[in-house]
A protein has these predicted regions:
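Active-site-proximal N-terminal segment of extracellular/periplasmic enzymes that hydrolyze or transfer
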Residues: 2-55, 65
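A long, amphipathic alpha-helix that forms part
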Residues: 14-15, 209-231, 238-280, 488
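Secreted, luminal/periplasmic, and some membrane-associated catalytic domains
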Residues: 26, 41, 57, 64-66, ...
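Short catalytic/ligand-binding loop motif for oxyanion handling, primarily in non-cytosolic enzymes
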Residues: 31-33, 66-68, 82-85, 155-166, ...
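Short, structured active-site-proximal loop/turn typified by the sulfatase FGly-forming signature C/S-X-P-X-R
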Residues: 35-89, 146-148
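His/Asp/Glu-rich, glycine-adjacent segments
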Residues: 78-244, 377-378, 382-410, 429, ...
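Substrate-binding rim/cap in mid-to-C-terminal beta-strand-loop elements of soluble/periplasmic
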Residues: 306-335, 453-492, 496
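Short, surface-exposed loop/helix-turn segments at secondary-structure junctions
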Residues: 444-455
Length: 499
């Protein structure tokens, strides 16, 4: 699919071949809500992309199906057993401390706002994301493709960016809180912290409800001035809106996201002109499910000495890491590991709202639920939908697995074996991982939850199946893959540019 060649700008670097590519990530968009928005004519830009392109309504998320893990998978094409970003909240064994990427303002305040911001903005990319995997920015930068990105959790690239000081308030904050440069795409616009050039666009320091407008402003500027071959166009406000209103409220926030996509097209001279020069991928990172009840891990594991949010370990036995509809438990007292793990599994299974308990044991993944215990490992006689092979034994009812003609699959827990295996074998994951039942969410360290609203994070299909559509790139039919996942997006981007 050939289009107009890219034009070299004063920043240097050029690429000619396929048309430019925009990767748009609408955080938390539920397929049924996107379809409703299109049906109600609230999303005309997306409707055009669907009409001219290929639409997938069941693209499988990562597990935990939570934004930092999903963002790293989208950006690298790998799961966390390779990229090493395990969850929204996790315990850093090497540094003997919690890492909190911003579950809520209250959770960040519990661990220290400054520490949470440093982990989210700096350490996630520069220390926590594995150096052994490449982001799409790094791959394309190495090929001299002009890269650009708006505020997205994973931004690591080959170009150096210093902190922005465009306004007095951002200058003050960036002198006191953020003092160091980062490596990102050629054009990086991350809230008001990093901006590779003056655009006149403001995000009010990444304030929810303003972030999509900032992305639209920056994106239209980049299109108008021909400053990219590849743009990661991040629209996070849908997720925030859905957390408050529940998934049924997404039509309004999807309409807002669509306006920013139309703004991008208008900067190119209208939708026809935009699609003549650009291919586009539009996707969600996960879906959301309505939350009706909460799970307090503090109460459930009160019998153990739980590591406190700050300060020394002081004889703590375990660390507890709630992350919306997923959670991790880390054994700190290594000498008592064999004693503690069975007790922790038993307590987790007795906790109302906990659906699955996952762990790694003697070369196998083990998932336990009220239905029994299931064990599995790669390289066996059963093939999953994507062609991975597994040895599986135990109670298939744990994951509602079906098996026939040498195949194994689950409708309730899509791509369950591969996702669970990546999670339990990730070196930074908890010793136990918990997945909540539909309708339940783990209260975070700040006491916040989304009861009455939406949330995500589990292995269940309700928050694990999302949107993926493409236009002007990729295969001609969704049937090109028997099952699409987040891991397929980075390869599609690289292939678009001949890599």
């Amino acid at each position: 699919m050939l289009g107009t060649p890219a034009t070299e700008d004063a920043a240097g670097g050029s690429w000619s071949g396929a048309r430019k590519l925009v990767l748009c990530v609408i955080d938390g968009v539920a397929p049924q809500m996107l379809e409703r928005a299109v049906e109600e004519e609230r999303a005309p830009a997306i409707a055009r992309f669907i009409e001219d392109g290929v639409y997938v309504d069941d693209c499988v998320s990562a597990f935990p199906s939570i934004t930092p893990v999903c963002a790293a998978t989208i950006a690298t094409g790998t799961a966390q057993d390779q990229h090493l970003i395990p969850n929204m909240n996790w315990y850093h064994r090497g540094e003997a401390r919690y890492v909190e990427y911003g579950s809520s303002f209250a959770a960040s305040r519990t661990f220290g706002i400054h520490r949470s911001l440093l982990d989210t903005i700096y350490n996630m990319n520069l220390a926590h994301l594995s150096p052994d995997v490449q982001t799409v920015f790094e791959s394309l930068d190495d090929a001299d493709v002009r890269t650009a990105g708006t505020t997205f959790l994973i931004y690591r690239g080959r170009h150096r960016h210093e902190i922005a000081r465009e306004t007095p308030i951002t200058g003050l904050l960036n002198r006191t809180l953020f003092r160091h440069g980062v490596w990102g795409p050629r054009e990086l616009f991350y809230a008001d912290v990093f901006a590779s050039r003056r655009t006149g666009c403001r995000s009010q320091l990444g304030l929810p409800g303003v972030r999509d407008q900032h992305t639209g402003c920056v994106g239209s500027y980049l299109v108008e001035h021909d400053l990219f071959d590849f743009l990661l166009f991040s629209l996070p406000d849908n997720d925030t809106h859905s957390h408050k209103t529940g998934p049924e409220g997404q039509v309004e926030s999807i309409a807002g996201a669509d306006r920013e996509l139309q703004r991008l097209a208008d900067a190119a001279g209208g939708m026809d002109a935009f699609l003549e020069a650009h291919a586009i991928i539009v996707m969600g990172d996960h879906s959301q499910v309505l939350i009706e009840d909460r799970i307090s891990l503090g109460e459930a594991f009160a019998a153990w000495k739980v590591r406190r949010p700050v300060g020394p370990e002081d004889g703590a036995e375990i660390a507890v890491c709630p992350a919306q509809r997923s959670a991790g438990l880390y054994v700190i007292d290594e000498e008592r590991r064999d004693e503690l793990l069975p007790e922790l599994v038993g307590t987790a299974l007795e906790t109302p709202g906990v659906d699955l308990v996952l762990r790694h044991d003697d070369g196998e993944a083990v998932i336990t639920s009220a239905q029994g215990e299931l064990r599995f490992a790669p390289d066996g006689p059963l093939a999953d939908v994507r062609g991975g092979t597994w040895s599986v034994r135990g109670d298939f009812a744990v994951l509602e697995l079906q098996s026939a003609h040498g195949g194994v699959w689950s409708d309730e827990y899509p791509d369950a074996l591969a996702r669970a295996w990546a999670a339990v074998t990730c070196p930074t994951s908890g010793d136990l991982l918990l997945s909540a039942a539909p309708g339940y969410e783990f209260t975070d360290w700040g006491g916040a939850d989304h009861v009455g609203g939406g949330s995500h994070g589990s292995l269940h299909r309700s928050d694990s199946q999302g949107v993926l559509l493409w236009c002007g790139t990729g295969p001609d039919r969704r049937e090109a893959r028997p099952q699409w996942t987040l891991r397929d997006v980075a390869p599609m981007v690289r292939q678009h540019f001949g890599l």
